[in-house]
Amino acid sequence: MQLSSVLLTAAGLLAPVYSSAIISIGRRSEGLDVSLASTGNTKVQVSVTNTGSSEISILRANTLFDASPTKKFTVYKEGSRKEVPFKGVHLRRSPSDLAKDNLQPIGPGQTIDKEFDLAETLNLSESGTYIVSADGVFPIIDPKSFSIASVIPYESNELKIEVDGKQVSGVLSTRAKIHDHLAQRADFNNGNCTDHQKAVIASALKRDSSIAGEASNAALSGDVRVFEQYFRTTDPSIRQQVSDRFHAISNEACSAEGGVVKYQCEDEMDVCRPGTVAYALLGSNVVVNCPIYYSVTAVSQACDAGDQALTVIHELSHIDAVYYPATTDLAYGEDASMALNADMSIRNADSYTFYANAVRQNCNPS
């Protein structure tokens, strides 16, 4: 770029040239109510009520309707400011693989109840009072086009439960043993990966390190409009935090064989169902690539697309050992992520994934 262009851009007189526009979907302010109730010790019932006047179809993936051991609740021990560490999985799914069996219809006035045992994904062996809540967004799907039409944000009541640790000591043990087993045997060269898979992973990590590095710089000194589009704020302290996370991800990605995260290519947790690209095992610093990962585009060219390197960013953002606190999955896909508020955005993995892509693709903030 010539000096004159630099000066004009800095002065705000010459707008940058963008590859395409970023377009956000609608955010519905009402229509679903979420309430939590205790059903005994570590078990919690979730009741989702459609308070609107028409039937809607909710995407199950990464929501309270997802049967996978994904993060659905925020849990604190009373008197502590530190969240109880999550021991389940964070999944990355392909938005192009939506199907009817991924939808949860709910009619007007209808309530759907789901029961979860918190001890299956949290270590609640210490007796006492715990505070449980849930927040996020429900992606609403157009059943004709199978695309996300809008999102409905939700925030549950705050529930206090009394836990007897002696009753739950064995609940997490089976899953924990699998985690420990994978953590001990999974590394870049010994995770049941073929030579082809190793080559794909190594290439994706190299690209990820560069993409995350660019995003780290952009978060601090790049176009503030693009940052605000994904993180809903221009607060300098938040920009610094986002930059620091990307910097940590970049460093981890360039340390494929010496980093804290290990790669596994065999799905011993049995969660690589259709549409699941990869998942992170929380507490074990293990990322598992599902078979579909190797058919995902290596390098995307669109502002709202994903690829192998962006999947790496998504999964590494979930690992506490890379950057604390780790992200979670509050929204699915770019459109739903851009409908989050500032507090949710900074905690949401896909907000980082698609911001990094927007920086790389030079996408235009709408």
From Swiss-Prot:
It catalyses: Preferential cleavage of bonds with hydrophobic residues in P1'. Also 3-Asn-|-Gln-4 and 8-Gly-|-Ser-9 bonds in insulin B chain. Its cofactor is Zn(2+). One of its GO terms (biological process) is proteolysis. Zn(2+) binds at residues 314, 318. Its main location: secreted. Its EC number is 3.4.24.39. Pfam families: Peptidase_M35. The active site is at residue 315. InterPro entries: Fungal_M35_metalloproteases, Lys_MEP, MetalloPept_cat_dom_sf, Peptidase_M35. Belongs to the peptidase M35 family. This is Neutral protease 2 homolog BDBG_02110. The lineage of its organism: Eukaryota, Fungi, Dikarya, Ascomycota, Pezizomycotina.
